[in-house]
Amino acid sequence: MSSAKPVLDPAFQGVGQKPGTEIWRIQDFKPVPLPKADYGKFYNGDSYIVLQTTCSKGGGAYLFDIHFWIGKDSSQDEAGTAAIKTVELDTMLGGRAVQHRELQGYESDKFLSYFKPCIIPLEGGFASGFKTPEEDKFETRLYICKGKRAIRVKEVPFARSSLNHDDVFILDTEKKIYQFNGANSNIQERAKALEAIQHLKETYHNGVCDVAIVDDGKLQAESDSGEFWVLFGGFAPIGKKAICDDDVVLETTAPKLYSINNGQLKLEDTVLTKSILENNKCFLVDCGSDLFIWVGRLTQVEERKAASAAVEEFIATQNRPKTTRVTRVIQGYENHTFKSKFESWPVNSAGSAGAEEGRGKVAALLKQQGVDIKGASKSSAPVDEEVPPLLEGDGKLEVYCVNGSAKTALPKEELGKFYSGDCYIVLYTYHSGDKREEFYLTYWIGKDSIPEDQEMAFQTANSIWNSLKGRPILGRIYQGKEPPQFIALFQPMVILKGGISSGYQKFVEEKGLKDETYSGDGIALFRISGTSIHNNKVLQVDAVSSNLSPTDCFVLQSGNSMFTWIGNASSYEQQQWAAKVAEFLKPGVAVKHCKEGTESSAFWFALGGKQNYTSRNATHDVVREPHLYTFSLRNGKLEVTEIFNFSQDDLLTEDMMVLDTHGEVFVWMGQCVDAKEKQKAFEIGQKYAEHAAAFESLSPDVPLYKVVEGNEPCFFRTYFSWDNTRSVIHGNSFQKKLSLLFGMRSESGSKSSGDGGPTQRASALAALSSAFNPSSQKNKGNDRPKSSDGGPTQRASAMAALTSAFNPSAKPKSPPQRAGQGSQRAAAVAALSNVLTAEGSSQSPRIGDADTAELTPSAASPLSEGASEFSADKDAPGDGALSEGGRTEPDVSVEQTANENGGETTFSYDRLISKSTNPVRGIDYKRRETYLSDSEFQTVFGITKEEFYQQPGWKQELQKRKHDLF
């Protein structure tokens, strides 16, 4: 008896077993794995399948996205093969991937986020033959760039008629790359186009060519502008933008639901609810600009293929534009975009009964076909608790209790006591690693507090925030949802029953309620459940023995007597904390310690007698991936758009954005956002929390923060690969990007920023570095001609630029700067600025630390008179320059350290940790892990370096902190 032959393609055997990207090209109607060296290269005559595997933050099963990309010259048969093979790949992965159709030039933001900064499809294909850039003679090309974050680069005819006033264009010539900014073009699109220029420069010019900016409508007598127009046959007016069919984007419409049966679509006249989606059927949700195919878990593979084909036919017969997005989701694994099309989405876990049933059937099907599904899922192994980033210690803590229109400062001995009937304002002033004064400002809302006190707490906190010029991060925290950074400020934090404000007392009296406010001479029971500095919150509970639990420790107050009760299953940390809490509540009183089972009669008497009790099941918040969104308000309804694979570069200074970590929600505000809009941050944040509560099980009482660009705290930065030097460069998005990538300044930038400050100095240092290090610009192997080093002329230009930076009153017009080595110049800028702005420092910056040196921010604005009560202590601890971790470091370079170690380029883990007793000197302290050998790296992190750097930046940072490599 012969076994059944697998119908699934063997090219997909064993895929999806680790995070990262895998790509196949369709060749002779079969998927062929693409070499990793060719990732990001797409030929317009081919079709591709792209699998993106990600590891969820909470562990458990991997998450999969499958994209099939269709080149504009790809044949219909190849495109159809890609669609069918995508379904097979999904089946191989257990049938839970989200599938996306991608047309060349109209790719989704998520797809483009895998290939930053952009993709520029190449001519040719497998059938017609490939043309590589190396084989081609250099040809001048004109590109149009669109997109504020995910940039779409499209080649257009090299002619003046292609230009317009509304878009951004890149003209790539053999010796120079020009960016033409249409007069009406978007500032953020101009900034993203610079990233495309950097990509062209590195890919086709070996990193060595000049870059020039040409502004539409500005006819200065500049050589760059003149050269640009000469290439088009001389200057002449350009026409208005012509709208073509490919630019048509349908508006998002009210969703329509179609059932799909035997390849036929039927419009369902019903309200769109989750309950009508049957697990043995496929459905189409038509939203105009977006189409979603929903697939029930119990459908067969052939049914899924037929549904995809039916939707393709639907698009053709409806004559939908190419910009129409098509996404296929599986029951139980619907993405946020799909769920948001419904009025609400009752939350069930992805591993619901229906999902598990379907997954089991798919697994059985694969086994029958002899397919190895070893890599289809990842077991849910327990995850070690990770201590989140906490605020620097030794700061100044001020706490105020709201009492009507007044606020009362708590004395030092009362700090940490919170009554559930009251509201509080907390201001913590501290100094970060670079000695900068920072503020953590929050207002805490007790669960039994009255609305008037809640409103007064918000108004007072907002007034303080305004008086401090928006520098603090401002948070709203509800009782029971305290974030770790808040809890860690108080050692201990104890939540007491009742309230002491006049408003609460009046409310209790008017309602005839029993006043349960904590009294120092009464009977009270406190539960200690936390085990670490960031979660050791203590809660007063009803003083009855049924509230005891073997997994916790308790403190019992009975008049002047104090008991600690130690559960048999409690931890050593809880036991220590119980003794500390008892001393905090009753300083100097002798504490009677009793273990579970050894209680005295006095103990039981205080609790009203002995009763049965059981172990309390501790609840843990679901760990979710962080998400970054842009948003808009339409008719009062919040609409959000996700930024995929986000980074610090996505925080654009003209925007307000929402970062949802599931543990807290941040509303981030760029410096260029209007002041009136900034005042709406909490309103926006609350609307988002309500929106996410309906679809993603987010609590509407989640901690809510607003933070202004340049004042991001450590627990916000940890979700990004953060570079402090970026936050001190002033200007709009375009000006910042121009300075960061090329050390250049735009004409508009000079007008808006006075003498230029850091931007001008960046330009000066870039020119100086380029002039005196011409060897750094050597050819990397490309045979194309490159511009000369410049010699004395370039050095003269560099000295002129440097002189201008140090003498802002003298502003000679500098010649265009060379545009090489963006990252190298950024490092040089940081080193130079450190020299220029460091105050009270007794040492000079080390060459080995140039790429990690931080720029000193501008001085803090003085507080207003009305905020004097909340003013922070200005005395910064310590003196002298400190490296990361607060240690004074000797002036030693990496090279010298390597020589002392016999030429080693790697170091042992014990020497690289931040608390090492024998630290390595002169390394990049922000990238300690890079100095580990490959074998020791895998021993420490449990994964290879390649796998580590494929993870999101925030996840890398958390793991580095866990292993003391930060």
Swiss-Prot record:
Residue span, HP domain: 901-966
Keywords in alphabetical order, please.
Actin capping, Actin-binding, Auxin signaling pathway, Calcium, Cytoplasm, Cytoskeleton, Repeat
Keyword Cytoplasm, does the record have it? yes
Task: From the UniProt record, give one GO term of the biological process aspect.
Answer: regulation of cell growth
Gelsolin-like repeat ranges per the UniProt record? 29-112, 150-221, 273-338, 414-487, 535-604, 645-716
Positions of the UniProt region annotated as Disordered: 771-910
Q: One GO CC annotation, please?
A: cytoplasm
**Compositionally biased residues, Low complexity:** 818-838
Q: Name one Pfam family in it.
A: Gelsolin
Q: Where in the cell is it found?
A: Cytoplasm, Cytoskeleton
Q: Where is the composition biased (Polar residues)?
A: 894-910
Keyword Cytoplasm set for record:
yes
What does UniProt note about where in the body, tissue by tissue, this protein is expressed? Mostly expressed in growing tissues.
Family the UniProt entry places it in: Belongs to the villin/gelsolin family.
- By what name is this protein known? Villin-2
